């Protein structure tokens, strides 16, 4: 459905129905006490308006807390010290998810990982060949990552790769640790589905601006290609080239 049509449908609902509709597309904190002005903003985000915010963990209880750039920059150093920055939350086009603050790296500093499973058609992952309907509406990165890791655990593919390196390193990612930051990151990180990657590529410029201001330019998306967790066939998976899609 066209996002503007979906937004118009939301506007015609009464408040309770609006709340339920927003919850169904990821705005889980909305309730009957949410101000009408906030509900109006959420409805815009469910359409075509982009909303980017800083994702943090509150050290006191590990809860995720989100701040706009202006909110974070206006806080005192003492108040900032109560939170650990873990990434950027993206909300747009009826979807929301958190983008990690930095790339995955192994012990040797390597940032490039094989997908694994070459020659294996993974049961539980739909094959999306060229032109498949719904290809760009794939937002099931968590479910895909679960299947990939479980299915390929300890399996050597026909090219000698064991397991699922890209999915495994994504799932093992930690934005903070108890030893270094005073709190352990319990976020379930994933290898994004193609639709999630396409949304990141679409808003790369805006995302990079916020990443630079919060984490430094060394952490921005580069004009490189990034694996998705969406399978093409038994021997190929989709990736997105961030220089052009």
What does each of the following model-derived ranges do?
Residues 2-7, 14-17, 173, 194-245:
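C-terminal, surface-exposed recognition/capping segments
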Residues 1-185:
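Short, compositionally biased
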Residues 48, 75, 118, 192, ...:
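Enriched - but not universal
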Residues 188-189, 197:
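Catalytic and binding regions of secreted/periplasmic enzymes and modules that target cell-wall glycans
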Residues 130, 162, 166, 190, ...:
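Extracellular low-complexity Ser/Thr/Asn/Gly-rich intrinsically disordered segments
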Residues 97-100, 190-192, 226-228:
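Structural recognition of the beta-strand scaffold that forms the well-ordered cores
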